[in-house]
Amino acid sequence: MNMKLTIVTPEKRILVGQEVDEVTVPAFKGELNILPGHAPLITTLETGVMKWKLKGKEKQDLAVISWGYCQVSPEGVNILANIADLPEEIDLQATKEFLALSEKKIMNELITDEDWAEFQRDWAHARAKIEAAEQQPAKK
């Protein structure tokens, strides 16, 4: 049974109709692993690292996604994400610096509920980017 994966954001297409053996997404209630023949569903996605294995490959590919939707149908999996970053697009040092500055700022300032919610989103996205970048093999 074949399963195709498409990942799109408002700015770019990461994958379009690529055959995959497995997809794992950060769903609303935890990690969701999707294999060929999975029951149809639509779910919201949280910020985190999604993974997939292209058909016949051993290595998992990954991307950091920030909020979106996942649709599973008999034809495959469609990911509509607000943001999707591939590991090679991530500046690990800049992300770590951003995270440190954000954490320092949040500890030293009074903030509104809205600012707190924004901090939580940004923090989760930065942590996921660091996780993805650190999982990627070093480039030669």
Curated annotation (Swiss-Prot):
GO CC terms in record: plasma membrane; proton-transporting ATP synthase complex
Database matches in InterPro entries: ATP_synth_F1_dsu/esu, ATP_synth_F1_dsu/esu_N, ATPsynth_dsu/esu_N
Subcellular location per the Swiss-Prot or TrEMBL entry: Cell inner membrane
Cross-referenced Gene3D superfamilies: F0F1 ATP synthase delta/epsilon subunit, N-terminal
Organism domain of life: Bacteria
Keywords: ATP synthesis, Cell inner membrane, Cell membrane, CF(1), Hydrogen ion transport, Ion transport, Membrane, Transport
Pfam family, one: ATP-synt_DE_N
GO MF terms, alphabetically ordered: ATP binding; proton-transporting ATP synthase activity, rotational mechanism
Family label: Belongs to the ATPase epsilon chain family.
Complexes and interactors: F-type ATPases have 2 components, CF(1) - the catalytic core - and CF(0) - the membrane proton channel. CF(1) has five subunits: alpha(3), beta(3), gamma(1), delta(1), epsilon(1). CF(0) has three main subunits: a, b and c.
Protein name in the entry: ATP synthase epsilon chain
Organism field: Bdellovibrio bacteriovorus (strain ATCC 15356 / DSM 50701 / NCIMB 9529 / HD100)
Gene name for this UniProt entry: atpC
